[in-house]
């Protein structure tokens, strides 16, 4: 820890897909030792990402998955930050979630990300596919499914930063792709 360190905590949505109707942080802000609250509506340029900056820092006005961050608090102790999160009131309008990836790409599926649920699409053509299929002694048309693989990183979901008062910030974190993190922080 650092002297005079603040502890930040994120309030996560328990909805898979919803519209944020309102967020009331006033009760958390009244707590002694809570120095700041923040919502997605208050974040300028509310987006980040390693390749495309299309992920909200804090979700607003749409929650796109369970666990989306919707508000943040900074307090003098970790316990106080946790207690402050419990005082934040969020009103959601639930929207239809989509849990099946094959359903998500159908034209009539609810759109989670703007106009399409397809992140990106590229056509790669090499060789004569039709000829290869025609000339092959065996062609199999099957659908394969495998178990879901959970993303279980070894690194913790934590960052510590120290500001020296002269415009220099030192950030400590554990992340596999550190050069992408550096790029994100330099942009913001």
Where are these regions (language model features)?
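Structural alpha/beta core scaffold segments of enzyme domains
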Residues: 1-188
